[in-house]
From Swiss-Prot:
Residues 15-339 form the SAM-dependent MTase PRMT-type domain. S-adenosyl-L-methionine binds at residues 28, 37, 61, 83, 112. This is Protein arginine N-methyltransferase 6. It is an enzyme of class 2 (transferase). PANTHER family: PROTEIN ARGININE N-METHYLTRANSFERASE, PROTEIN ARGININE N-METHYLTRANSFERASE 6. The lineage of its organism: Eukaryota, Metazoa, Chordata, Craniata, Vertebrata. The active site is at 126, 135. Disulfide bonds: none annotated. Belongs to the class I-like SAM-binding methyltransferase superfamily. Protein arginine N-methyltransferase family. PRMT6 subfamily. Keywords: Chromatin regulator, DNA damage, DNA repair, Methylation, Methyltransferase, Nucleus, Repressor, S-adenosyl-L-methionine, Transcription, Transcription regulation, Transferase. GO terms for cellular component: nucleus.
Length: 340
């Protein structure tokens, strides 16, 4: 019993830390300024106006309330905007400023303890983090679905897919080469710093950076898919899949990139993509660097599997287990983390 209480206390502290991050304007500015993200949601919601007309919506993790406003614009009669951070007060101001007080009710609460007096026809949420699962807000959406969504109700978005691809990261090479160039700049040889820089950059921490299509060394592989209408808490705790690549040509392989898409239902399907082949989003791509770069050639085979799961220390943080083999060689394993 004492251990259970300790774990609940630790989880409560972790939740408070998470919600505190969303009490700062910077993160909301970044998200709303992301036009791919925000317009994607706006289009998806407005395209579902027939499904939302005159109905009730639950907005999980409402933030500043912009998605709730979109839902009313699409014809929703009532929206419950649930937001656990202090920014819920600003969401109320946004609702008032847009003349929607009589249709949007802002609730300052985690969804797990929210008091919602009725079943809802639709759930909307922008729950995705880096590599889809960082910050682990999806369990809250599943909780809300199981507790309040009517049979036949809709979830926006309704599906998510995770992709992986091998990459060459030119930024890494540039950062490493910098230490060889210092002597030319200042007359001081600092090339001895390169191994240290290498160990700092190509470590076990997942990085978030923007790639170009030229950085991708093979066709991407979808390794995990989620149907938000039916997926369970247990399923989303461990996302696992295998991959097999055939390289396009001669290059240095620095590691692997992860990205995701989410799909919204409706007469006109809307897909929001964080792929390096698409427009830039604030999610960018999540990078898993190998310990050492490896030379690959055209048609070099890369096989393996990957598992994403919550951190044991903080379930809102993320860990990855990567197993891989290059050119039929030794199978290697590397553990990664994002957060603790």
């Amino acid at each position: 019993m004492a251990l259970l209480k300790k774990r609940k206390h630790e989880r409560s502290e972790q939740d408070q830390e998470y919600f505190q991050c969303y009490s700062d304007v910077s993160i909301h500015e970044e998200m709303i300024a992301d036009t791919v993200r925000t317009n994607g949601y706006k289009q998806a919601i407005l395209h579902n106006h027939c499904a939302l007309q005159g109905l009730t919506v639950l907005d999980v993790g409402a933030g500043t309330g912009i998605l709730s406003v979109f839902c009313v614009q699409a014809g929703a009669t009532r929206v419950y905007a649930v937001e656990a951070s202090a920014v819920s007060q600003l969401a109320s101001h946004v609702v008032t400023l847009n003349g929607m007080d009589n249709k949007v009710k802002v609730l300052n609460s985690p969804v797990e303890s929210a008091e919602i007096p009725e079943q809802v026809d639709a759930i909307v949420s922008e729950w995705m983090g880096y590599a889809l699962m960082y910050e682990s807000m999806l369990p809250s959406v599943i909780y809300a679905r199981d507790k309040w969504l009517k049979p036949g109700g809709i979830i926006l978005p309704s599906a998510a897919d995770l992709f992986i691809a091998p990459i060459n990261d030119r930024v890494v090479e540039s950062r490493l080469d910098f230490w060889n160039e210092v002597k030319g700049l200042y007359g001081v040889d600092m090339s001895c710093m390169r191994p240290f820089a290498h160990s700092c950059i190509m470590n076990k921490e997942m990085a978030v950076n923007l790639l170009s299509p030229e950085d991708v060394l093979s066709f991407p592989v979808r390794f995990a898919s989620l149907d938000l209408n039916v997926c369970t808490q247990e399923e989303v705790r461990n996302l696992h899949g295998s991959f097999q690549f055939s390289c396009f040509g001669s290059s240095l392989l620095h590691g692997f990139a992860l990205w995701f898409t989410v799909t919204f239902p409706g007469e006109k399907t809307v897909t929001l993509s964080t792929s390096p082949y698409g427009e830039e989003t604030h999610w960018k791509q999540t990078l898993l660097y190998l310990d050492e770069e490896i030379q690959v050639e055209q048609d070099t085979d890369i096989t393996g599997d990957i598992t994403l799961s919550p951190s044991d220390v903080n379930p809102r943080h993320l860990r990855a287990l990567l197993n891989y083999s290059i050119g039929g060689g030794l199978r290697r394993t590397k553990h990664f983390h994002m957060g603790t």
